[in-house]
Amino acid sequence: VLIVPNALVGPALRLIRANRAFVSEAGARRRIRERALRPVPYGPPATLRPDVRVDVERFGDWPVYTVSPTKRAATGGVVYAHGGGWVGEIAPQHWVLAATIAAETGATVTLPIYPLVPYGTAAEAQTGMIELVRRSLDRHGPTVLAGDSAGGQIALSAALRLRDDGIVLP
């Protein structure tokens, strides 16, 4: 495991020009237009851990994947919203994280492929997450929300609305 001090992350990203497409408004618009023309695949990597199973179904217009443990009984659920700054699709590291959570905790992990900018809105993503949490509660019992970057914002927004609706999560 490589541990990088936080103070080095920003300079390292600038050095490798990781976010060069998003440095200017014009660059961001070009990248979004290119991704609309040539979408990035969002399916799971060809190989994940051997101790999980991946399934997919439709939830309205969204593909929704579930990653379930195969070596132990599934207990509980996690609804995980991937990061990507609202413009980036789910990446291999998100799949690895979901598989690790499923295998090591026994939870069934739900991964929605929510619509990205310019095709979706934060409100649509939040509403979809709320419905997926309700479904996970019915199917898997106690359910937690998780997410990173844009997905963290989606998860937090959904959690606040669920709280306001009287839904108690672990």
Regions found by a protein language model. Give the residues of each.
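Short, small-residue-enriched loops and turns at beta-alpha junctions
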Residues: 86-88, 118-120
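Short beta-strand element of the alpha/beta-hydrolase
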Residues: 75-84
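A glycine/proline-hinged amphipathic helix-loop "lid/cap" segment
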Residues: 1-69
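Glycine- and small hydrophobic-enriched segments that form the cores of compact globular domains
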Residues: 84-85, 108, 131
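The serine-hydrolase catalytic nucleophile loop
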Residues: 88-99
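Short strand-loop-helix active-site module centered on a catalytic nucleophile
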Residues: 64, 79, 101, 122-170
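Conserved alpha/beta-hydrolase
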Residues: 98-119
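Short glycine/serine/threonine/alanine-rich loop segments
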Residues: 41, 107, 141
